[in-house]
Each structure stands twice: as structure tokens, then as C-alpha cells.
Amino acid sequence: MLMPKRVKYRKQQRGTVRGMTKGASLVHFGDWGLKAMESSWITAQQIEACRLSMVRTLKRTGNIWINIFPDKPITSKGIGTRQGKGKGDVEGWVAVVKKGRVMFEIGGVDEATAKRALEYAASKLPIRTKIVQRYEIGGEL
């Protein structure tokens, strides 16, 4: 699973996910990308499930770029534990994804294969997504 090697603070507040992404809204590395149409948390397990489904679809051809990383710790208190006595233990890691962010990119394969791989990856995610194509400067492919 993806997780940071070390962090400055072990626990974070939850915060809110509002607004559009500031960067990473275009496909930069590959030819096709999977763009988030909603804001949400994406867990490390969901990212790994997407990666595996894309790798199995591509079958040793093409390249995959993962543009999100789970760097936010999520805590929870044990079942049957009363409130108080401090914040719970870290249970997992999530990536904060805002609307408009390109999360995954694929390159080096034909259009049909890339779209099929990204559709499989999208089915593993809890948010609405859109498959986008890379455009060169000037609007041409």
C-alpha cells in the first residue's frame, strides 16, 4: 500500500474538501487520463485496486502514471471505546482529491485499450470520473 515513509505529525484534523483543483487538471505525461468530477478522499487501497486493474488490462504494454498520493492519515477509535482520552490511532491513509484533478494517466497504447483500462479503474473509485485526452498547445493532437 502507498503511504508516506515518515511524517512530521502523526495525526491530522479531517478538514473539508471544497472547490476545484489548483493544478494537475490536464494530462501531462500520458495520452489519456482519468479526471475526478467530484471532490473526495481516495484511500490507498482504492488507488492500489485501480493500479492493479489497469496493469492487468494493459498486459505489459504502455505506461501508467499515478498522480495522487495518500499523505493524509485517517484515525479512528476502537469499537466500544468511550469518547475522550485523546485522538484514535491511525487506521489508514487517504489522498485528498478535488474536482477536476487528473488522477491516473496512460500512454503508449491504442485508444480502445486505454479507455477500457481507465473504465475499469473508474469502477473501483467512489466518485464520478471522466476520461480525458491529452491536447498539445494549440488545441491539436
Swiss-Prot record:
<keyword id="KW-0687">Ribonucleoprotein</keyword>
<keyword id="KW-0694">RNA-binding</keyword>
<keyword id="KW-0689">Ribosomal protein</keyword>
<dbReference type="GO" id="GO:0019843">
    <property type="term" value="F:rRNA binding"/>
</dbReference>
<keyword id="KW-0820">tRNA-binding</keyword>
<dbReference type="GO" id="GO:0003735">
    <property type="term" value="F:structural constituent of ribosome"/>
</dbReference>
<dbReference type="InterPro" id="IPR000114">
    <property type="entry name" value="Ribosomal_uL16_bact-type"/>
</dbReference>
<dbReference type="GO" id="GO:0000049">
    <property type="term" value="F:tRNA binding"/>
</dbReference>
<dbReference type="GO" id="GO:0022625">
    <property type="term" value="C:cytosolic large ribosomal subunit"/>
</dbReference>
<dbReference type="InterPro" id="IPR036920">
    <property type="entry name" value="Ribosomal_uL16_sf"/>
</dbReference>
<dbReference type="InterPro" id="IPR016180">
    <property type="entry name" value="Ribosomal_uL16_dom"/>
</dbReference>
<protein>
    <recommendedName>
        <fullName>Large ribosomal subunit protein uL16</fullName>
    </recommendedName>
</protein>
<dbReference type="Pfam" id="PF00252">
    <property type="entry name" value="Ribosomal_L16"/>
</dbReference>
<dbReference type="InterPro" id="IPR047873">
    <property type="entry name" value="Ribosomal_uL16"/>
</dbReference>
<comment type="function">
    <text>Binds 23S rRNA and is also seen to make contacts with the A and possibly P site tRNAs.</text>
</comment>
<comment type="similarity">
    <text>Belongs to the universal ribosomal protein uL16 family.</text>
</comment>
<keyword id="KW-0699">rRNA-binding</keyword>
<dbReference type="GO" id="GO:0006412">
    <property type="term" value="P:translation"/>
</dbReference>
<comment type="subunit">
    <text>Part of the 50S ribosomal subunit.</text>
</comment>
